[in-house]
């Protein structure tokens, strides 16, 4: 009997499980007895690694810690209870014992592990886009869906505007007006020339923010401008793909001199939404909300359905046709992705 050939997905899963097994086999857990640890204290996770995390205490001191096995997940921004060891063991200074309930979190779908949290307790999501390699309103809309579902205030930042001629700049401003019309804040900046960087740092001082955006849009350059001492590695835009190379290896929370915190994470280069269904995506479009539920049919797909209130609002100029088209493009892409991955919401 011929041996059944494994599918590509099955092969990937086997390779992933094998790698995880080898990692567990090689890892030597550090065992902390109770008498080796000090009193419980509060802290914030400022960096997360594969099996460790850096925790900052209330005095601003940072300690590398192990995680109790009972902790299901831990991300940058988490507020935790931890205990410092009486001495370091293999470079580790303490143990994280509990995580306080999160005010919010942003997550991305992971092919093997399901929905994977990226960061927690965020006040603002900074959506960074750029004129190079291209301005994609579709990508901006994807990030805005995440913001709306997580109920986190967004700021749309267009970087590298120094590359624009005045005529091009006006064209870009006209494209972005559809977001201003529905209440989103826009900031056109240049990390190179410094244009509007003071406004950006003033907004960042208002809480904890996280940068999101494709590689090559200048996130690392912005961090270098805001925090020169950090010197985040800057990657060039690939001439062949138009996408920048990975420049950040671990999620990190930075304290800003003027106040506020900034989280930079490599886990948000590709912000997949294939874990969401059509209803959730629809709720991610804020200007749709006032007409939802008023269509003639309850199962309206908001396409050519008779009596569609959403399509009627577009025809009347109350809703941007660009946003409407991006919405359906996103719904269609989700169906294709789930089919390719054999993914189910059940």
UniProtKB/Swiss-Prot annotation:
Its EC number is 3.6.1.-. It is an enzyme of class 3 (hydrolase). Gene3D superfamilies: Nucleic acid-binding proteins (2.40.50.140), P-loop containing nucleotide triphosphate hydrolases (3.40.50.300), Probable gtpase engc, domain 3 (1.10.40.50). GO terms for molecular function: GTP binding; GTPase activity; metal ion binding; rRNA binding. Zn(2+) binds at residues 295, 300, 302, 308. Keywords: Cytoplasm, GTP-binding, Hydrolase, Metal-binding, Nucleotide-binding, Ribosome biogenesis, RNA-binding, rRNA-binding, Zinc. GO terms for biological process: ribosomal small subunit biogenesis. Monomer. Associates with 30S ribosomal subunit, binds 16S rRNA. One of several proteins that assist in the late maturation steps of the functional core of the 30S ribosomal subunit. Helps release RbfA from mature subunits. May play a role in the assembly of ribosomal proteins into the subunit. Circularly permuted GTPase that catalyzes slow GTP hydrolysis, GTPase activity is stimulated by the 30S ribosomal subunit. Belongs to the TRAFAC class YlqF/YawG GTPase family. RsgA subfamily. This is Small ribosomal subunit biogenesis GTPase RsgA. It comes from Haemophilus influenzae (strain PittGG).
């Amino acid at each position: 009997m011929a041996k059944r050939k494994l599918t590509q997905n099955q092969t990937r899963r086997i390779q992933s499980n094998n790698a995880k097994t080898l990692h567990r086999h090689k890892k030597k857990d550090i065992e902390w007895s109770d008498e080796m640890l000090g009193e419980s204290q509060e802290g914030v996770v400022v960096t997360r690694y594969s099996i460790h995390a850096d925790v900052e205490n209330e005095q601003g001191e940072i300690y590398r810690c192990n995680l109790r096995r009972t902790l299901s997940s831990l991300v940058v921004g988490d507020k935790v209870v931890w205990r410092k060891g009486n001495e370091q063991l293999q470079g580790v200074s303490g143990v994280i014992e509990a995580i306080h309930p999160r005010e919010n979190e942003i997550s991305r779908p992971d092919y093997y592990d399901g929905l994977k949290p990226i960061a927690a307790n965020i006040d603002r999501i900074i959506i960074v886009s750029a004129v190079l390699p291209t301005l994609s309103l579709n990508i901006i809309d994807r990030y805005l869906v995440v913001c709306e579902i997580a109920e986190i205030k967004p700021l749309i930042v267009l970087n590298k505007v120094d590359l624009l001629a005045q005529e091009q700049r006006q064209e870009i401003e006209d494209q972005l007006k559809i977001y201003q019309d529905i209440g989103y804040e826009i900031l056109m900046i240049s990390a190179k020339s410094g244009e509007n960087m003071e406004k950006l740092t003033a907004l960042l001082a208002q809480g904890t923010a996280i940068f999101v955006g494709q590689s090559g849009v200048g996130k690392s350059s912005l961090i270098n401008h805001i925090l020169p001492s950090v010197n985040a590695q800057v990657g060039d835009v690939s001439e062949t793909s138009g996408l920048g190379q990975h420049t950040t290896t671990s999620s990190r929370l930075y304290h800003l001199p003027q106040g506020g915190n900034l989280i930079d994470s490599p886990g948000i280069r590709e912000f997949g939404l294939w874990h969401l269904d059509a209803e959730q995506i629809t709720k991610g479009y804020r200007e749709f909300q006032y007409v939802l539920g008023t269509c003639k049919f309850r199962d309206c797909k908001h396409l050519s359905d008779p009596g569609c209130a959403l399509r009627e609002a577009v025809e009347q100029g109350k809703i941007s046709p660009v946003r409407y088209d991006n919405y359906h493009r996103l719904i269609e892409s989700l169906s294709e992705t789930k089919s390719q991955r054999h993914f189910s919401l059940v």
